[in-house]
């Protein structure tokens, strides 16, 4: 039996998918722009 692949970790999740991580790259900023355009209430995982 293999182990479960999803091992939740809040810090790693925020470091990878958080607001500052999105702002750090051009593509990340594009993600934020499209989520804003769509009207998402939560832009990133750090907006709890």
UniProtKB/Swiss-Prot annotation:
GO molecular function, one term: structural constituent of ribosome
UniProt xrefs under Pfam families: Ribosomal_L34 (PF00468)
InterPro entries: Ribosomal_bL34, Ribosomal_bL34_CS
Gene Ontology annotations of biological process type: translation
GO CC field: ribonucleoprotein complex; ribosome
Keyword vocabulary terms for this entry: Ribonucleoprotein, Ribosomal protein
PANTHER family (UniProt xref): LARGE RIBOSOMAL SUBUNIT PROTEIN BL34M (PTHR14503:SF4), MITOCHONDRIAL RIBOSOMAL PROTEIN 34 FAMILY MEMBER (PTHR14503)
Family (UniProt): Belongs to the bacterial ribosomal protein bL34 family.
Protein name: Large ribosomal subunit protein bL34
Originating gene: rpmH
């Amino acid at each position: 039996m293999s182990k479960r692949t999803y091992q939740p970790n809040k810090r790693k999740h925020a470091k990878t998918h958080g607001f500052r991580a999105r702002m750090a790259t051009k593509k990340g900023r594009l993600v934020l722009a499209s989520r804003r355009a769509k009207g998402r209430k939560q832009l990133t995982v750090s907006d709890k």
